[in-house]
Amino acid sequence: MKTVLGNISANEINAALCHEHICCYSEYLHMMSGRDYLDLPRLEEKAIAELKELKLKYGLNLFVDCTPVNIGRNIELLKSVSEKSGVHIVCSTGFYYTDEPVLYSSSAETLAEHMIKDSKNINAGIIKAAVEDETLNSFNAKLLTATAIAQKELNLPVAVHTNANNRNGLKALEVLLENGVSPQKITIGHLSDTENMEHILEIAKSGCYIGLDRMYDNKSEEYINKKVNAILRLCDKGLENKILLSHDESFFNGFEASPKLKDNTRFSYVFEYIRPRLPESVWGRIIRENPIEMLEV
């Protein structure tokens, strides 16, 4: 599998988080306001320290950074954090769903060419795609088509940001499948945002991965039990080998109303609150084996 510091083998992996971010930010605002907007050196120090701690306490040594190029992907930052923390980091090529002039004016084929070149330059291990609204418009379809073209050339897995409450994961999945992407190469993300198990199972029928990758910092018994029960129900349906756990967390989210470097993150949540309630065999499958199978190329 591919990381920012080079390729690694499966036997190097102990535990993986499959949908996270070191940071998401606007390069435009950073150019305009510098450290008043984002103090990158301070963020880097914090990320290194926290990843070191996660590795020491929980064995985490693979961190999939799903930040696409147009919301602040910073390869030099990822390389430095990986090298100094000892945690392997997988980076993404691909585009977020935001309608930007260059994305609007370029064809699917042209965007795919950019992704292919970018992936080879940065050793990307995953392609990020994204849909948000209930209805997929022609712009969304074009980005997904570009993703499919690039995927078939690169043979990389695709991670799709979706809005589970809009049920748009099915629509994104349909476009990718129609354009020749194998379901085994697709993760439909953020399905932990819905309690509609029928919707999740409908997506799972395709054979794609199920991203239960938005675990929030909610320590109530009700919330924890809902998340654990959803995992166990999927296991009962024979889907144990298709579940991916993560948080969709970042040290800095520059798109919030008042963005700031976070004092507390929730990267440890699944280790502290989900793991103790799962059989060890299920936990091992979800936190290690499934990520390896998803990422191997």
Task: State each model region's role.
Residues 19, 63, 151, 210, ...:
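Divalent metal-coordination and catalytic microenvironments
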Residues 121-195:
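Divalent metal-binding pocket/active-site signature
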Residues 80-83, 88-154, 208-209, 214-219:
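Active-site gating/metal-coordination segments in enzymes
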Residues 69-70, 188-194, 215-233:
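Active-site glycine- and acidic-residue-rich loops that bind
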Residues 86-87, 154-157, 177-184, 202-211, ...:
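Glycine-enriched alpha-helix->loop->beta-strand junction motifs that scaffold or abut catalytic
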Residues 1-7, 11, 265-297:
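Mid-to-C-terminal alpha-helical segments outside catalytic/metal-binding sites
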Residues 213, 239-260:
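Short acidic/histidine-rich active-site segments
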Residues 13-18, 23, 31-88, 108-123:
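Alpha-helical scaffold segments that flank or form the walls of functional sites
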